[in-house]
Amino acid sequence: MGALDEGCLNLELDIGMKNGCIELAFEHQPETLAIQDAVKLLLQGLHEDVNREGIKKTPFRVAKALREGTRGYKQKVKDYVQSALFPEAGLDEGVGQAGGVGGLVVVRDLDHYSYCESCLLPFHVKCHIGYVPSGQRVLGLSKFSRVTDVFAKRLQDPQRLADDICSALQHWVKPAGVAVVLECSHIHFPSLDLDSLNLSSHRGFVKLLVSSGSGVFEDESSNLWGEFQSFLMFKGVKTQALCRNGSSVKEWCPSVKSSSKLSPEVDPEMVSAVVSILKSLGEDPLRKELIATPTRFLKWMLNFQRTNLEMKLNSFNPAKVNGEVKEKRLHCELNMPFWSMCEHHLLPFYGVVHIGYFCAEGSNPNPVGSSLMKAIVHFYGFKLQVQERMTRQIAETLSPLVGGDVIVVAEAGHTCMISRGIEKFGSSTATIAVLGRFSSDNSARAMFLDKIHTTNALKTESSSPF
């Protein structure tokens, strides 16, 4: 019986037996399977081959990321807070705030992400929390991030997220008061219109600063609020930009601002697929804030469907040199913005492309032309992609147009790097492709990379939260 008992124990461990109930493995759970089926339908709506290597496992990866990113629906604040309240007496009898440790406690710069309920794209949240302890007890500092995560890992809007965090801490910790300030950053929506693309729209973000207060922080004109804001200003938070206008908060998502431009022709099956995803995440698709979400999400996604944009490369004739061919010199086209969608997770990545090539001094000073280069970058960006492939494709397309010597560098921020378990905020990725002279001439590559550094050092760049 000993061997049999051991075998039964191993079986229970393998299938995840808990409290007499069988817990299905993640990949076999109904919610995961439903999301995978919906994602397959969306990929087909983008005219993609769901069996193509590279996106064959995309439905599962998307399901995993979405369920991971909305796990807060199944989490409870009390599970994190109740075991982390520690006794701490006030400084002296009658001294300090409400019998606590003597004053305000501020926890700053808690990085999180949440999914925007208006468009289903992730947005970055930098959370700052202040509270005045009461009842001679304090909360373990790590639990502030845990509590924030419970509510961030849901479909949210910034103001409700701030209110949820504030009310939960007030209820479970029971301090004299709680103050919450959130710095939220949402990526812009891309446009298929090449003329509308510009560097600022790629490096900039829609930013919003919201707050919530309870107890002694209910009055935002109080001295305590001023003290809390002072601690935030030490870290460069521009508290004067706090949004106290409800309509501004509701319209902060770029998809809401452009709702009047929504296409009336949306595939009903694709809409049903997004509705199925919402249900599988534990949401109510009929909640008023979510009614237009499937259509907004599809408007964004359909930007990246497989299409044949006319680049008119066949009509392009490289400039010929008149007379004696002189020494070739380096030509550069830097900071050309692009948008793309990661084919592994169906999340955006965006950034800039730098192109360098050699051509004879006696030829046209800009033989290819900025507009054609931007069109090529635009063409390879607006589709399901991986950055490495996009960089190579741009180089291979340009090579015969510029005489073979070309270098392409792409720099991008990947949303999938922040909105999944890895959560690498502030990370970026650079890729390089070289052909012709650049593949063997180290000094040529160094000259081009120095051009990028010198040019960007002279510019004031807006910071990215990703």
UniProtKB/Swiss-Prot annotation:
Pathway: Cofactor biosynthesis; 7,8-dihydroneopterin triphosphate biosynthesis; 7,8-dihydroneopterin triphosphate from GTP: step 1/1. Keywords: GTP-binding, Hydrolase, Metal-binding, Nucleotide-binding, Tetrahydrobiopterin biosynthesis, Zinc. Zn(2+) binds at C342, H345, C416. The keyword Chloroplast does not apply. Its EC number is 3.5.4.16. It catalyses: GTP + H2O = 7,8-dihydroneopterin 3'-triphosphate + formate + H(+). InterPro entries: GTP-CH-I_C/QueF, GTP-CH-I_N, GTP_CycHdrlase_I, GTP_CycHdrlase_I_dom. GO terms for biological process: folic acid biosynthetic process; tetrahydrobiopterin biosynthetic process; tetrahydrofolate biosynthetic process. GO terms for molecular function: GTP binding; GTP cyclohydrolase I activity; metal ion binding. Belongs to the GTP cyclohydrolase I family. GTP cyclohydrolase 1 is the first enzyme in the biosynthetic pathway leading to folic acid. Homodimer. This is GTP cyclohydrolase 1. It comes from Arabidopsis thaliana.
